[in-house]
Amino acid sequence: MIVSNKHARRNYELLDFFECGIVLKGTEVKSISRANCSINEAYVQIIKNQALILNMHVANFFEGNNFNQDPYRNRKLLLHKKEIIRLQHLVKTQHMTIVPTKIYWKNNKLKIEIALGKGKQLHDKREDIKKRDLARETRLF
């Protein structure tokens, strides 16, 4: 695993996970493989039946200054058409959000795991903290 999104589990109740490819240009692959990227504030939107990851930061590759892309450009995700339609339906009807959870290598290709989630309220976050603390205390005794 190269990069993970720790904020996603705290801010969302993650329900369903999907593995998808990502369309990258030039030196972005090298930059991501050196973990010079951030998906903490990224999210996925479906625009014109294409899944796009927005607000994902990929730092410029230092050695490849002539071929660098915009660090915050929109990147296309590679999903099957049925998966895109299903995600689009759930986002519209149940008011869910699609967030990236991690980036990793699989068979020499970069993959992104995205999750379908519902946003947590402040009281839900507090309940999770209480449950986690209680479980930690019971393990100690």
Swiss-Prot record:
<dbReference type="InterPro" id="IPR023620">
    <property type="entry name" value="SmpB"/>
</dbReference>
<protein>
    <recommendedName>
        <fullName>SsrA-binding protein</fullName>
    </recommendedName>
</protein>
<dbReference type="InterPro" id="IPR020081">
    <property type="entry name" value="SsrA-bd_prot_CS"/>
</dbReference>
<dbReference type="GO" id="GO:0070929">
    <property type="term" value="P:trans-translation"/>
</dbReference>
<dbReference type="GO" id="GO:0003723">
    <property type="term" value="F:RNA binding"/>
</dbReference>
<dbReference type="Pfam" id="PF01668">
    <property type="entry name" value="SmpB"/>
</dbReference>
<comment type="similarity">
    <text>Belongs to the SmpB family.</text>
</comment>
<keyword id="KW-0963">Cytoplasm</keyword>
<keyword id="KW-0694">RNA-binding</keyword>
<comment type="function">
    <text>Required for rescue of stalled ribosomes mediated by trans-translation. Binds to transfer-messenger RNA (tmRNA), required for stable association of tmRNA with ribosomes. tmRNA and SmpB together mimic tRNA shape, replacing the anticodon stem-loop with SmpB. tmRNA is encoded by the ssrA gene; the 2 termini fold to resemble tRNA(Ala) and it encodes a 'tag peptide', a short internal open reading frame. During trans-translation Ala-aminoacylated tmRNA acts like a tRNA, entering the A-site of stalled ribosomes, displacing the stalled mRNA.</text>
</comment>
<dbReference type="GO" id="GO:0005829">
    <property type="term" value="C:cytosol"/>
</dbReference>
<dbReference type="InterPro" id="IPR000037">
    <property type="entry name" value="SsrA-bd_prot"/>
</dbReference>
